[in-house]
Amino acid sequence: MNLKQLIYKRLVHAKDIGGLLAKYAGRPAVFDTEAPDDKQDGWEGKTQYPRLNIVLDMQANEERSSVGSLTITIYTERTSMVILEIESLVKTCFRDLLISPEDGGPYSFAWARTDPFSIEGTNVIGQDVTFDIMEYSAQETTDPDPIVALSRYIKKLYPDSIVLGVDPVGEFTEASVTPIFYSRLVTMDKASGHNMNIVAWMDCRMAVHLLCPDKAMNLKMLAAVMQKISVDEKISFWITHQ
């Protein structure tokens, strides 16, 4: 499935959200396009609200360090009192979550803002709940690879964690259940003064990210990685080719 399909799947299968939404064709009223009009049989003559619409924009925003944005639009009737509850549940649905589609990623989501609105001339109000999307793409570079070596080093230190690039991940991975490490290459430059005819030395700067909602645990685990590297003073590189 692609990213938009997985976002739709996540929302449709969220029972706490689905229980508050209208139904269309027997399923929670979640749409990744414009909602069908009120004359469609899928509504079965019942109310069209509350309902959700998905808007996915994969245009990168360098200022916010995001690869795109996700907007979940909530529509309810003005007399309904559930819009704030649905907003809270939608935010929770994507918190501390990694989604891994077939066409990229993995991706995580950070709530950016909520914009309320009303539709003039109707009894409908709504909220646009917008998330920034961050991508945790593969960072392998060469062989031997500094990112692969660092990722395996962290996996050995924390075998029960998920290390991207080492561990397989499913469509949905909850950082609240298992901490997720991600290593990326910041810079890689040829070192001066150490090169020989058959050897070229490279200076690499790498960053380690940890997705873990427990802030105290997050700090403790990252500090342990830094301390272990400082004590060992080296990370062994595995040669991956045969």
Show the residue positions of the predicted features.
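Small/polar-rich, solvent-exposed N-terminal microdomains that initiate assembly or binding
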Residues: 1-63, 92, 96-110, 136-189
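Glycine-rich beta-strand-turn "strand-cap" elements at beta-sheet edges
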Residues: 56, 113-124, 242
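Short, solvent-exposed beta-strand/turn "edge" segments of beta-rich domains on protein surfaces
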Residues: 59-65, 120-123, 193-201
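Oligomerization/assembly interface segments of phage tail-like spikes and tubes
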Residues: 65-78, 124-136, 200-216
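Short, conserved charged micro-motifs
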Residues: 80-85, 141, 215-224
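Short, acidic/charged, Gly/Pro-enriched secondary-structure junctions
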Residues: 83-103, 226-237
